[in-house]
């Protein structure tokens, strides 16, 4: 056995040699150099730890990735190489990299400020424009550096932009980045996070025809800017498939509220978000834009200081009485986005203005008006609807908004925010035992968004006598009037809340003049259920004049409510309500509000709803600015003149009508709402118009603060509890923001709470929630019962000045649900990221395999061509060698034959010459004999003369004879030479013909080979294209399976949540009914005592009848609840099925689109092949013609050559032949005479 076989058996030396990487240290334990001091997070490919160098104490973020093979290790080398090669102040630096025990450690620079999206989540608000400018400029500089170094980031988003404590940013996460080798190189990988993908990247999912370049990062930058301005990226409420379609087909996204932002910002976004790649600006061009001409990073330093500030948390539990009251007064509060509380605190007015310049352009600074849940309440008293239709319209609307917020009832105080102007009005409350006084820190500015209540040094003073409260109310009024006038002088602008998708105005907050002192009252008549006239007084009083009158009104109201509290009654309705509101601009004066969901004005379409807006300039109110209680009364102009008996009769009527109306939708209707006094105060100066337009979807990430009433119930005063109990189901005219959200029924709505990298595959939560309209009351009551108030106080130092910011937030179960949803979406995004990584690896492997196939086939083509040419060249060479040998042999034979023939002829001629010489000798003898016969004396002279004559004649004869022999010899030799030349010509011609035939065969074989190579290359490219599309289909199906799985999980979560909510509602309903029955019975008995005209037996009979009616009503309520639950479950299941169908439809469209692209590409490939073959054949004809012409020319040259040779030798026939020169005929001198 050989040694090599021995090695094969024992696998000696067969292990693949480990590849060494420049920046990765192998077989070194990183924990010997770095100490893990904490965990930072859990990324898509592994955990991220906080590490510290044991020698230098440098901090680093250590990403630990489990890699099972060398191939997986190579996937991360691009990221490591990019990090190692980049040296820029705005790009994180690679500190170290190890590969140890199948774990890849990547240690990068630690940024203590955290990611931008994490900071927004921590502060629960978006960035200001000045902060966005700083982040944008530094990000642009980093991108410009990357693009100059041929690097495409491909995953730019707020989560990959990190803050340092110095106020700078660093770009991170190059896990999916691409490092090109050429400047103009393009990419066609479908990779990145869907919400930030450029349109040209999205198109690469199904078509690789139009690859992208560095400008894809510019689009992602524009999306990231919108994300920083609105907390969420555009279309974040959609599932990724819808997002991809939206990006590809719709117009570029814009800001939700353009009026809030500067023109430079909007123009910068237009330059970034240009769908035409050629028209989109580059990073170098964007760096010249005026939006990024900032030098100081102070806004970011302040932001980081606030985010990293010391936080003190305080949790307050709500009291049971409050919770029960709130169960009757559930208020829709938006909770569909990241919580936001625009805080920006400065130490002086100048600091405030400089720090919040961008905010103050569109959002006024908001004074904190926090209210403690268990200390006081603002009651909203509402008349019970007399008909079911209009009531249900509003109820469904309120319930829809309640549900759409996910029951996330962050009970907070929110003021009306104008564009650069805030009206501050005094808070006066009609509570005998409770008063809440709030002071605003002058050195602080609190800006609050939809789900947060910002509190600055809130002091609550409880249980004061009524006289003290009135006095303090007056003082509070005066102090707040001063503040209001100061701010009114500073900020006089206008802000509109606009729905982004439809452009419809939901509410116009219009600034009003600063003049005070005008008092105006308007009376509106409405018909109640029994046809009696009802009047609502809309009063507009100045902040100074109407204070005493309002105090008198509230005292009257308190007296009347006390008189109605005898017996078991838990509730009594305040009989007098004063309305404070300036006339709105429009056809109807008196501040008439409109109801947007149905496009109906409350005064026109809902006569049973006449909310009383309480005046805040002096009243201790028990009603809200958005609701008006209508009391049955005589035809009078003054509400204060209503008698006590009329009030009680009205209460009784409300009890009866309310009982009938509640059977239809008590659980699903929004309960009566308390509105913070700040709303009332602002409403007196700022008329609110809710335009009656069709509800439409709005941008979910709208950061602009809107009007949201807080829900505050006072459990310490019996009077107010009784007042609230007197209303079985008060109604509420919803504020503009819930109306705004009512339109969010579509996928672009605000129904889901997501993080910045939301990857949820489901449709908008609001699309489901809008289906469950009438299910809110009981679940909201349960949520209210469990809520806690969380106060956060942040203390930090900005430029040497310590700043304290306090925020209050209601903590409910929905908060944990939001966190759970965010976690689930983060998991889904990680799954998507891992899937993309696997796809990228598989694509790279396939590309490598296909490239190898192409190289192999081209190498084989070349080898076959060389082999074929070599074969024919060898044959031609052999033919030429054979021809040469034949010619040489023939020439040798010809020479020998010529020599032999010359010898033979020469021998014969020598014999003939000797004979001729003998003849001449004999003649000479004869002449001599004749001379001897002559006389002797003559003989001598005659002999001499005769000899001379004989010699001359014989010499001439001999010369003539020799010449004749030479001619004969030359003729014979020439004949032989001509024969040989003809023979050679024939052989040469035959050889040339054979050679040309070989050359023809060679060319034909080459042409055939070329054609076969073209066919094989086409088949290979076609098969490779099919393999690529098969891979794409496979990857697309895997993505679709993952999306379907996520959709099913989401649908299951919705069903489980609905089941839980319905279970809670079923459990709560008996308790609510018992409490309600008790209250209604007490009110009924009280009304009997007041109108005691019957005997006790008759009263007892009436009470029995009333109890029977109550039992029947409760049974109807239970039945209605059961039917509603079944309807909700059915609607939800239908919605889930519709969601799945829609998802499958989108998936099928993508698969169909991919198949169409494949068919189109195959068709194009066939057309290209046909064209190439056609062009090759067209080029083949001239090649054949040229070859034949070359062959004819060579034949002609050969013929001319042989012809010229023959002629040249025959030009001088008398000349001695070349051959005869070699074989000379013997002359006379060679023969002896």
Swiss-Prot record:
Region forming the signal peptide: none
Residue positions, PTM Phosphothreonine: 183, 812, 1095
GO process terms (BP): apoptotic process; cytoplasmic microtubule organization; protein autophosphorylation; regulation of apoptotic process; regulation of cell migration; regulation of focal adhesion assembly
Molecular-function GO term, any one: protein serine kinase activity
Biased composition (Polar residues): 432-441, 619-630, 746-761
Catalytic residues identified in the record: 155 (proton acceptor)
Main location: cytoplasm
Modifications made to the protein after synthesis: Proteolytically cleaved by caspase-3.
SMART domains, per the entry: S_TKc
Record Pfam families: Pkinase, PKK
Region (Disordered): 309-351, 363-453, 498-650, 663-761, 772-791, 944-963, 1109-1129
Broadest EC class assigned to this enzyme: transferase
The UVR domain, residue ranges: 873-908
Biased segments, Basic and acidic residues type: 363-399, 518-529, 598-607
Tissue/organ expression: Ubiquitously expressed.
Residues annotated as site: Cleavage: 436-437
Biased composition (Acidic residues): 312-328
Protein kinase domain boundaries: 34-292
SUPFAM superfamilies cross-referenced by the UniProt entry: Protein kinase-like (PK-like) (SSF56112)
Transmembrane segments: none
Subcellular location: Cytoplasm
UniProt biased composition (Low complexity): 690-701, 954-963
Function noted in UniProt: Mediates apoptosis and actin stress fiber dissolution.
Family: Belongs to the protein kinase superfamily. STE Ser/Thr protein kinase family. STE20 subfamily.
Name of the protein described by the UniProt record: STE20-like serine/threonine-protein kinase
Organism the protein comes from: Mus musculus (Mouse)
Taxonomic lineage from the root: Eukaryota, Metazoa, Chordata, Craniata, Vertebrata
């Amino acid at each position: 056995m050989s040694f090599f076989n021995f090695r094969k058996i024992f696998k000696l030396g067969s292990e693949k040699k480990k590849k060494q990487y420049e920046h990765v240290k192998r077989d070194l334990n990183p924990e010997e150099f770095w100490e893990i001091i904490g965990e930072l997070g859990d990324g898509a490919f592994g955990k991220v730890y906080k590490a510290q160098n044991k020698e230098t104490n440098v901090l680093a973020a250590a990403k630990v990735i489990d890699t099972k093979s060398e191939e997986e290790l190579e996937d991360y080398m691009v990221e490591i190489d990019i990090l190692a090669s980049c040296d820029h102040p705005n790009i994180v630096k690679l500190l170290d990299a190890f590969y140890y025990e199948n774990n890849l450690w990547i240690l990068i620079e630690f940024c203590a400020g955290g990611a931008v999206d994490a900071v927004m989540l921590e502060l629960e608000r978006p960035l200001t424009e000045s902060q966005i400018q700083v982040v944008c400029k530094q990000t642009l500089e980093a991108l410009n550096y990357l693009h100059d170094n041929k690097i495409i980031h491909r995953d730019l988003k707020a989560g990959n932009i990190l803050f340092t404590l110095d106020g700078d940013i660093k770009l991170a996460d190059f896990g999916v980045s691409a490092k090109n080798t050429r400047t103009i190189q393009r990419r066609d990988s479908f990779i990145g996070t869907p919400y930030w993908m450029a349109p040209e990247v999205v198109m690469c999912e199904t078509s690789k025809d139009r690859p992208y370049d560095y400008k894809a990062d510019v689009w992602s930058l524009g999306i990231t800017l919108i994300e920083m301005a609105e907390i969420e990226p555009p279309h974040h409420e959609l599932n990724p498939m819808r997002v991809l379609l939206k990006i590809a087909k719709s117009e570029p996204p814009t800001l939700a509220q353009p009026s809030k932002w500067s023109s430079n910002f909007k123009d910068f976004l237009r330059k970034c978000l240009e769908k035409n790649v050629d028209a989109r600006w580059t990073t170098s061009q964007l760096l010249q834009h005026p939006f990024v001409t900032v030098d100081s990073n102070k806004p970011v330093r302040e932001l980081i200081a606030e985010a990293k500030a010391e936080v003190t948390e305080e949790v307050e539990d709500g009291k049971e009485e409050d919770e029960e009251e709130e169960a009757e007064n559930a208020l829709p509060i938006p909770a569909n986005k990241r919580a936001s509380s625009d805080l920006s605190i400065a130490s002086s007015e100048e600091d405030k203005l400089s720090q919040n310049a961008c905010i103050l352009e569109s959002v006024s600074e908001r004074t904190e008006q926090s209210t403690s849940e268990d200390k006081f309440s603002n009651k909203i008293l509402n008349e019970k609807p007399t008909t079911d239709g209009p009531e249900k319209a509003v109820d469904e609307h309120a319930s829809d908004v309640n549900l759409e917020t996910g029951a996330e009832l962050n009970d907070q105080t929110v003021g009306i925010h104008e564009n650069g102007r805030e009206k501050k009005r005094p808070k006066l409350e009609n509570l005998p035992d409770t008063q809440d006084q709030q002071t605003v820190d002058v050195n602080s500015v609190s800006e609050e968004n939809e789900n947060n209540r910002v509190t600055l040094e809130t002091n609550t003073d409880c249980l004061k006598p009524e006289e003290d409260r009135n006095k303090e109310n007056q003082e509070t009024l005066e102090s707040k009037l001063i503040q209001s006038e100061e701010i009114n002088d500073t900020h006089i602008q206008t802000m509109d809340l606009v729905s982004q998708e439809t452009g419809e105005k939901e509410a116009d907050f219009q600034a009003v003049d600063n003049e005070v002192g005008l008092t105006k009252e308007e009376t509106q008549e409405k018909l109640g259920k029994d046809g009696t006239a009802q009047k609502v007084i809309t009063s507009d009083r100045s902040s100074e004049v109407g204070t005493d009158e309002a105090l008198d009104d509230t005292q009257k109201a308190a007296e009347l409510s006390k008189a109605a509290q005898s017996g078991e009654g838990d509730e009594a309705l305040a009989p007098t309500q004063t309305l404070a509101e300036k006339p709105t601009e429009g056809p109807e004066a008196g501040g008439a509000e409109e109801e947007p969901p149905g496009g109906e004005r409350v005064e026109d379409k809902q006569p049973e709803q006449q909310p009383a807006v309480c005046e805040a300039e002096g009243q201790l109110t028990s009603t809200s600015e958005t609701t008006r209680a209508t009391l049955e009364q005589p035809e009078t102009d003054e509400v204060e003149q209503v008698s006590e008996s009329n009030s009680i009769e009205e209460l009784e009527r409300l009890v009866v009508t309310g009982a009938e109306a509640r059977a239809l939708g008590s659980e699903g209707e929004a309960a009566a709402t308390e509105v913070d006094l700040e709303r009332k105060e602002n409403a007196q100066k700022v008329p609110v118009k809710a335009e009656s337009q069709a509800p439409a979807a709005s941008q979910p990430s709208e950061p602009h603060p809107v009007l949201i009433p807080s829900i505050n119930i006072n459990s310490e005063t019996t009077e107010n509890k009784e007042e609230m109990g007197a209303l079985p189901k008060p109604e509420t005219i919803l504020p503009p923001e819930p109306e705004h959200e009512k339109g969010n029924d579509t996928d672009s709505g605000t129904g889901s709470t997501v993080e910045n990298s939301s990857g949820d595959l489901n449709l908008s939560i609001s699309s489901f929630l809008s289906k469950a309209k009438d299910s809110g009351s009981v679940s909201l009551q349960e949520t209210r019962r469990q809520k806690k108030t969380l106060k956060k106080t942040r203390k930090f130092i900005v430029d040497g000045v310590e700043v304290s910011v306090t925020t209050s937030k209601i903590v409910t179960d929905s908060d944990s649900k939001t966190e759970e949803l965010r976690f689930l979406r983060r998991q889904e995004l990680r799954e998507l990221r891992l899937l993309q990584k696997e796809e990228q690896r598989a694509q790279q492997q396939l590309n490598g395999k296909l490239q190898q196939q192409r190289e192999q086939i081209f190498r084989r083509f070349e080898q076959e061509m060389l082999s074929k040419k070599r074969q024919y060249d060898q044959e031609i060479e052999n033919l030429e060698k054979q021809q040469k040998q034949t010619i040489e042999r023939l020439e040798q034979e010809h020479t020998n034959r010529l020599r032999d023939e010359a010898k033979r002829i020469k021998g014969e001629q020598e014999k003939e010459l000797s004979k001729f010489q003998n003849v001449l000798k004999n003649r000479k003898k004869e002449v001599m004999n004749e001379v001897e016969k002559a006389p002797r004396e003559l003989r001598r002279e005659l002999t001499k003369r005769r000899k001379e004559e004989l010699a001359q004649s014989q010499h001439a004869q001999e010369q003539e004879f020799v010449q004749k022999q030479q001619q004969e010899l030359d003729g014979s030799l020439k004949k032989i030479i001509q024969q040989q030349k003809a023979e050679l010509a024939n052989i040469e011609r035959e050889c040339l013909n054979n050679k040309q035939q070989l050359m023809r065969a060679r060319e034909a074989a080459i042409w055939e080979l070329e054609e076969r190579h073209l066919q094989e290359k086409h088949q290979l490219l076609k098969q490779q294209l099919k393999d690529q599309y098969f891979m794409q289909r496979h990857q697309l199906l895997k993505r679709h399976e993952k999306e379907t799985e996520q959709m099913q999980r989401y649908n299951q979560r919705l069903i489980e949540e609905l089941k839980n909510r319905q279970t809670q509602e079923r459990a709560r309903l008996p308790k609510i009914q018992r409490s309600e029955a008790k209250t209604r019975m007490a009110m009924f008995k009280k009304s009997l005592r007041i109108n005691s005209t019957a005997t006790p037996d008759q009263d007892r009979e009436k009470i029995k009848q009333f109890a029977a009616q109550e039992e029947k009503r409760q049974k109807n309520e239970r039945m209605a609840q059961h039917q509603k639950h079944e309807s909700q479950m059915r609607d939800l299941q239908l919605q889930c099925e519709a969601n799945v169908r829609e998802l499958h439809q989108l998936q099928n469209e993508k698969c169909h689109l991919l198949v169409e692209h494949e068919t189109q590409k195959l068709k194009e490939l066939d057309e290209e092949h046909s064209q190439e073959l056609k062009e090759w054949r067209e080029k083949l004809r001239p090649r054949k013609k040229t070859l034949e012409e070359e062959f004819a020319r060579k034949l002609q040259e050969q013929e001319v050559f042989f012809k010229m040779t023959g002629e040249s030798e025959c030009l001088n026939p008398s000349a001695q032949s070349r051959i005869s020169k070699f074989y000379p005929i013997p002359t006379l001198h060679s023969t002896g005479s």
